[in-house]
Amino acid sequence: MPYKVKDISLAPQGEKKIRWVQEHMPVLERIKSDFSEEKPFKGVTIGSCLHLEPKTINLGLTLQAGGAEVAMTGCNPLSTQDDATAAGAKMGLNMYGWRGETNEEYYENIHRVLDHEPEILIDDGADMIFLVHRERPELLDGIIGACEETTTGINRLRAMAADGALKFPVMAVNDAYTKYLFDNRYGTGQSTFDSIMGTTNMLIAGKTVVVCGYGWCGRGIAMRAEGLGASVIVTEVDPIRALEARMDGFRVMKVSDAVKEADILITATGNTDVVSESEFMNMKDGCVMANSGHFNVEINREALEELSRETGKVKEDIEVFIMPDGRKIYLLAEGRLVNLASERGQGHPAEIMDMSFAMQALSARHLLQEKPDPGVYRAPDEIDLMVARMKLDAMGIEIDELTEKQRLYLENWEEGT
């Protein structure tokens, strides 16, 4: 199998990591077993643009077990784990990617995956989907559809569909209950602080943590910050989410006011310039900033650099920016996705990604079976419920079922008081 990775000799180390996550991804392992018998992807090429680490390699192996030829590249220049890509290549996957890619290399690797002429795409952030529309239109007729993992990617694709520019169907895997209620909330909450604490060795208890954005990712971050003993401030542009954050017990204020108190500031909005010039001018001395959104646009690093009288690297993944008045502001992982782009970041726990990648695998099979028209589609409820039931089963949990009388009662509109 063709591959382009940093060091193929790292494969044994990566294989150990993959075997470990497989033991903690029982739903995906069950699907892998089913796929190995059914071969739903026999003769199909699947191209993915995902964070290349042990859990995503396991997804690739699941698709491979289903008969697919799989080509994989990374969706972030800093999130690739080189031992995992080496192991994936040794296991028969077409791997393209390494940690520390330049922007040019990043897009070259996406093109390398597209050179395999995939019929199904699995994307995280929609860069591959956009690239095939803009630069490889000759491939569009051969693409059955795609699955998108993130809120950011789905927002971009819905805008594309609204303009009539989307040429094939996309399954919004992010909109599945078994994805966003767990991956976005519990996964992001835990992995964000795993990475921040591992990178900085800071104590969270007693700190003021500002969380920009109160979607499902922001909720998870705020919840974990509070659990670690921090005082939490939430910033929002949506009045309903802001009200919800206040009712959940957090202080709510404008970003411009919150930065004056922030010991740690974390962005999770999916939008651009959330923290920029005016915020940097008023930011508390010693504030540590991190981004948990998909793209590195939420914290305006360029503006921060221009405002600074001096910049430097404190240690791996920690930059310092010294302002004209002597204040120091710290930025983790270049403002990229901190839970994966940081050297210490391992991404979400395997038990969480078990559900998200189960949804990816089953949604890809659904695309192949149904071949819907171009557009953005929510994954069918039956797939969502199937994944939830398999996860409960793997956890040894049994739940009740409605009796026939209860079912009829819920369906009957005539009964009242």
UniProtKB/Swiss-Prot annotation:
GO MF annotations in UniProt: adenosylhomocysteinase activity; trialkylsulfonium hydrolase activity
Binding site for NAD(+): 150-152, 184, 213-218, 236, 271, 292-294, 339
Free-text comment on the cofactor: Binds 1 NAD(+) per subunit.
Required cofactor(s): NAD(+)
Residues binding substrate: 124, 149, 179, 183
Keyword tags: Cytoplasm, Hydrolase, NAD, One-carbon metabolism
Enzyme class, spelled out: hydrolase
Claim: NAD is one of the keywords in the record: yes
SUPFAM superfamilies: Formate/glycerate dehydrogenase catalytic domain-like, NAD(P)-binding Rossmann-fold domains
EC number: 3.13.1.9
GO biological process assignments: one-carbon metabolic process; S-adenosylmethionine biosynthetic process; S-adenosylmethionine cycle
Keyword Metal-binding: no
InterPro entries: Adenosylhomocyst_ase-like_sf, Adenosylhomocysteinase-like, Ado_hCys_hydrolase_NAD-bd, NAD(P)-bd_dom_sf, S-Ado-L-homoCys_hydrolase_CS
Pathway this chain belongs to: Amino-acid biosynthesis; S-adenosyl-L-methionine biosynthesis
Localization per record: Cytoplasm
Gene Ontology cellular component list: cytosol
Catalytic reactions of this protein: S-inosyl-L-homocysteine + H2O = L-homocysteine + inosine
HAMAP family given in the database record: AdoHcyase
Miscellaneous information on this protein: SAH is a product of SAM methyltransferases and is known to be a feedback inhibitor of these enzymes. As a result of this inhibition, organisms have evolved efficient enzymes to metabolize SAH via different pathways. The pathway found in methanogens differs from the canonical pathway, it uses the deamination of S-adenosyl-L-homocysteine to form S-inosyl-L-homocysteine for the regeneration of SAM from S-adenosyl-L-homocysteine.
Record family assignment: Belongs to the adenosylhomocysteinase family.
Functional note: Catalyzes the hydrolysis of S-inosyl-L-homocysteine (SIH) to L-homocysteine (Hcy) and inosine. Likely functions in a S-adenosyl-L-methionine (SAM) recycling pathway from S-adenosyl-L-homocysteine (SAH) produced from SAM-dependent methylation reactions. Can also catalyze the reverse reaction in vitro, i.e. the synthesis of SIH from Hcy and inosine.
Protein name: S-inosyl-L-homocysteine hydrolase
Source organism (scientific name): Methanothermobacter thermautotrophicus (strain ATCC 29096 / DSM 1053 / JCM 10044 / NBRC 100330 / Delta H)
Organismal lineage: Archaea, Methanobacteriati, Methanobacteriota, Methanomada group, Methanobacteria
